[in-house]
Amino acid sequence: MRTLRMLRQERGWTLDELARRTGLTKSYLSKVERGNSTPSIAVAIGLAEALGVDVTQLFGDAQDSANLEVRRVGTAADPTVPDSGSSFVHLAGGVVGKQMLPFLIYPPADEVECLYRAHSGDELILVRSGEIEMRFPDRTERLAAGDSVYFRGGIPHYVKSISPEPAEVLLVIAAPEEQA
């Protein structure tokens, strides 16, 4: 995410300042800037909010004038694999200033990376294939293909695959009002 460094420097911020504004460590932010670490979707949303930009600008696929984007089967970019273990494909990355942040995610099956995340904006998850387990602080839900869940992104949550085959999930996050 070399774009992160550019956006930070455009604001005249040091890594210390960005760390203060995001609650992330300076060393982690440095790793992200150098491309040695990839943030989760929740962390990327927090970075975008702190910088006052559309989250697509952090992934480097935003275009200035796209108001419509069609993605054909088989043309999706390779999934991004953040430090959280989930991999994801950012859908509609060329549209700037959108009110929804759509992703295809491929949740991990391991327990090691079970990190609860919270972020601004409401969230809709629809399981396209496989089965997942959605964990919240006070409950756990098992979802199969065709099942969905809607919740406030501010509720800490975690998703993991529980089926023998990898799960594919459509994730749509309502963009924070500042970005909408």
Task: Explain the meaning of each model-derived region.
Residues 86-87, 144-145, 153-179:
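Ligand-binding loop in jelly-roll beta-barrel domains
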Residues 111-114, 133, 140, 149, ...:
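Histidine-centered metal-chelating micro-motifs
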Residues 2-19:
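Short basic helix-loop element that most often maps to the first helix and adjoining turn
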Residues 25-37:
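Recognition helix of helix-turn-helix/homeodomain-like DNA-binding domains
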Residues 43-99:
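A short, N-terminal "cap"/entry segment at the start of jelly-roll beta-barrel domains
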Residues 106-107, 117-134:
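Short, conserved beta-strand element in jelly-roll/cupin
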Residues 77-116, 171-177:
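A short glycine-rich, His/Asp/Glu-containing loop-to-beta-strand
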